[in-house]
Amino acid sequence: MNLHRVITSRASVSAQLGIVCALTVAACGGGSGSGGNSSSLSAAPPAAMGFADTALVSNSGAVVATANKIDANLQNPWGIAVAPGLPFWISDNNSNLSTLYSGIGAIETQSITGSANVGIAIPASVAGVQANPTGQVYNGNGGFLIPTGNGQETALFIFDGEGGTIAAWAADSGAAAVTAYDDGVASGANHAVYKGLAIGTVGGATYLYATDLHNNKVDVFDTNFTKPTAMQGKFVDPNIPAGFVPFGIAALNGDLYVTFAKQDAAMHDESTGAGLGYIDIFDFSGNLKSQFASAGSLNAPWGIAIAPAGFGSLQGDLLIGNFGDGTINIFSPNGTALANFEGPLMSSNGQPIAFPGLWSLVFGNGDADKPMTTLFYTAGFADQTDGVFGGITVASTPTPVGY
C-alpha cells in the first residue's frame, strides 16, 4: 500500500484528548527484587498540580467503562512511534503485532491491513522464535532499505524484540513487516534479547540503537542493518554496579538516555524492586556524558519523556516511568550532577498515578489529535497479558477512577 494513500484516507480528527473523562490507575505493588541501593537523590515533596488519565484503547473488559475502544490485539503494548500526519504505531509484545491508533483512540490499523481486527505482523526469527516486539522507531531519514512487492524501499517503522530480531516496515510492505536482522537463539548462547530501540545521527549518518538485556550491551546498526566497527563508545558506565544492564533507551534533545535494570537469573528479563535502576546520558557515539539518576525511586525504569511547556509546571523536567511499580517519577536536571527527584506524577485526587506494567511515555507531536501537552503511554497490566494505550493531561476536574 502506498503510504500517501494511507495519509489521505485518514478521517480528519479535531477532538482533543483533554476533554475525555479521567482515569487514574490504582498503584501496583513492588516487584520481586530486593530493596536495592539507597538513593543518592534527595526526594522532594510530590508536585502539587494534578493530572488526569484517559484510557483510549484496551484489549480487556477491565477498562471497558473508560476506554474509548476495545482492540483484542493490544496485548502488553511496549514501544510507541509516531510521524507527522500518521497514527501512533504501537508494538504489541504478546500478539506479535503492531497496531495503529489515533490520539483519541480510533483504531486505524485497517488503513494498512484492510481490517481493524488484523494487525501488522512482526515475523518470528529464523529459528521460529516469536519476535515479541518491544521498542519501535519512525525513520524519516532514508536508508534502511528492505524488500517489498515494489522492490527495495526505505523502512519507515522499525521494531526490535525479545526474540533477538530487528524488523522493519515500508510503505509497500502491506500487512507484515520483514526481518532485517536476526540475532535470535539460532545465534547460540549469546543471542540477543532486545528490550528498547532508538534512532539518531552521528556526523550526518543515521544509526539504530537497540538495548540487549541478555548480553549487557547496546547494539548499534547503520542504515544497512549492519553493526559498524568504528563507533567510539560502548555505552558503559563504570559506576553502575555489576548485574545492571541496558533496558530502555530514548533519543531526547540530542542525547541518548539509557535506563539500566537489574538482570534476572535467566538473563532474559528485568528484576523489579525499590531502588533497582539507573539512568545514564550518552552521546550518539556511545560515550558517557553523565549519570542522570541512581537507585532511590527507580524500579526497573523503561519509559522516558521530557515535559513540554503547558504540562503543568514541569517544563524541562524528565518523566521516568517505572515498569516495576508503575509510577511516573519527576526529575529536574542538574547539569552533569545527579538530577533532583521531585516526586511522582500525581492524580487530581492527590494520589500517585501508577499503571501496572508501565512501558512507553511519549508526548504528542502537535497533530490535531496528538497535542504536545498530552503524555501518551502504554502498559501491560494483568502481569503483561493485557494492554492499555492512553493519555495524561493536566486535570480539569477531580474525577479519577481505578481499575
How would you name each of these model-derived features?
Residues N2-G18:
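Bacterial N-terminal signal peptides that target proteins for export
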Residues G33-Y403:
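Sequence/structural signature of beta-propeller domains
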Residues T24-A27:
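C-terminal motif of bacterial Sec signal peptides marking the signal peptidase cleavage site
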